[in-house]
């Protein structure tokens, strides 16, 4: 397959350093097997960057990311930085990174692996076989629309205002990402909106319907957001790929995530138009277990598989990494967060060793 790729590695805070080490090792193993190469370059972000430079996202870190083929991020944040002004906290680095890289599409898979069906809060017969991808628009909608703020009223009192706003262009570009993703999966795309009430959702639906003829191999359906929230719990297997606006996606992706039983298993990708994508686990920095070799690296490893698939167009390598994850789970290895009766509990490093062994044996 060939090719040499530059990856910006941002371990961040808490367990970030531990899980990123495992993720990088798996990427290196994939490169060896599938005949391509990586140049990894590490940079600080979040609290680690604040301690080193005074800024959560140093200019040098952002420039490295812009010059890379993809960005591989661990996690940011921790209680020692909670007293800082809001614009100086570690989490602000993520917003700056998304804006600086022009990322507008967030992809969050929620897949129930057969070995972890019992970890879900729902009955096995409800969640068995669930494999959902939520495509969330990241840069528009209620979180960013103008006007916004808290304003005085003429007769006294105050009024809070937020605006849900989308242009047809913004809807079309997220729609294309979703159609392409659905085409690579099972060919079913559910667009989630509130078109029975909101004009912005009526435009959303109109644009998605207009795109559909370009993707005749993808079945497009529509669902109101309140019904979707119910159906995710009632009959989640009906969904393949979901596309929705920012706030709806924020809520629904978290709901879909909890079908799986452990947030420690969930990867994510944030994509733009042609530049580097950002790949990170959904979970946070878990400062309470940092440095104790207790972290679950599987979400980081699966984020690496998404990096291989979406930014590097190496689908066979991505599948091989995902198979290694399934293999170690089949063998009974678990970190503490996904422990089950009869399982062999291992730490982060040992899980990484088992992953590499499974990958090399396959």
UniProtKB/Swiss-Prot annotation:
| This protein's UniProt keywords | Amino-acid biosynthesis, Branched-chain amino acid biosynthesis, Cytoplasm, Leucine biosynthesis, Magnesium, Manganese, Metal-binding, NAD, Oxidoreductase
Q: Which reaction does it catalyse?
A: (2R,3S)-3-isopropylmalate + NAD(+) = 4-methyl-2-oxopentanoate + CO2 + NADH
Q: What is its EC number?
A: 1.1.1.85
The entry's Mg(2+)-binding residues are: 226, 250, 254
The record describes its quaternary structure and partners as:
Homodimer.
Q: Which cofactor does it need?
A: Mg(2+); Mn(2+)
Q: Which regions span the lipid bilayer?
A: none
Q: Which domain of life is it from?
A: Bacteria
Protein name from the UniProt record: 3-isopropylmalate dehydrogenase
Q: Which residues does the annotation say bind substrate?
A: 98, 108, 136, 226
Q: Which Pfam families match?
A: Iso_dh (PF00180)
Per its UniProt record, what InterPro entries does this chain match? IsoCit/isopropylmalate_DH_CS (IPR019818), IsoPropMal-DH-like_dom (IPR024084), Isopropylmalate_DH (IPR004429)
What is the main EC category here? oxidoreductase
Q: In which pathway does it act?
A: Amino-acid biosynthesis; L-leucine biosynthesis; L-leucine from 3-methyl-2-oxobutanoate: step 3/4
Q: Which family does it belong to?
A: Belongs to the isocitrate and isopropylmalate dehydrogenases family. LeuB type 1 subfamily.
